[in-house]
Amino acid sequence: MAVERTLSIIKPDAVAKNVIGEIYSRFEKAGLRIVAAKMLHLSQEQAEGFYAEHKERGFFPDLVAFMTSGPVVVQALEGENAIALNRQLMGATNPKEAEPGTIRADFASSIDANAVHGSDSAASAEREVAYFFSENEICPRS
């Protein structure tokens, strides 16, 4: 099994609910290491750039508005099969369909305010981690 890196964003709804620590605990209990982290309030340009692949989709303006509505916590996670493991921890995009005990089942209120983002592939993970972190901001841990 390969050690991978993935990007996770704790979205404005979950930050507002004050569950950052509970989400971090789930990452760590699952064997993921937080190798970079920052809290920031995304600008419109940052949100549009990050979600550029969705620019032509109808939900894009609402997504950008939501992601800029309050602070987010962005982290790079590292571990064995980190991408799939993080997606398993997050649960289905729609919290109503998410398995009990997943982050979205426990902390999300709707498909739009769904608590967390996670990279969906190795290519996305590489691009997304680099979008928020320079190489010297990442602190690999063994």
From Swiss-Prot:
Ranges annotated as spanning the membrane: none
Catalytic activity, reaction form: a 2'-deoxyribonucleoside 5'-diphosphate + ATP = a 2'-deoxyribonucleoside 5'-triphosphate + ADP; a ribonucleoside 5'-diphosphate + ATP = a ribonucleoside 5'-triphosphate + ADP
SS bonds (residue pairs): none
Task performed by this protein: Major role in the synthesis of nucleoside triphosphates other than ATP. The ATP gamma phosphate is transferred to the NDP beta phosphate via a ping-pong mechanism, using a phosphorylated active-site intermediate.
Active site: H117
Keyword list, A-Z: ATP-binding, Cytoplasm, Kinase, Magnesium, Metal-binding, Nucleotide metabolism, Nucleotide-binding, Phosphoprotein, Transferase
Name the UniProt record assigns to this protein: Nucleoside diphosphate kinase
Cofactor dependency: Mg(2+)
Source lineage: Bacteria, Pseudomonadati, Pseudomonadota, Gammaproteobacteria, Oceanospirillales
SUPFAM superfamilies: Nucleoside diphosphate kinase, NDK
Record-listed E.C. numbers: 2.7.4.6
Record keyword Nucleotide-binding present: yes
Cellular component terms (Gene Ontology): cytoplasm
BP GO annotations: CTP biosynthetic process; GTP biosynthetic process; UTP biosynthetic process
Cellular compartment(s): Cytoplasm
Gene Ontology molecular function: ATP binding; metal ion binding; nucleoside diphosphate kinase activity
Main localisation: cytoplasm
Gene: ndk
Record's keyword annotation contains Ion transport: no
Assembly description: Homotetramer.
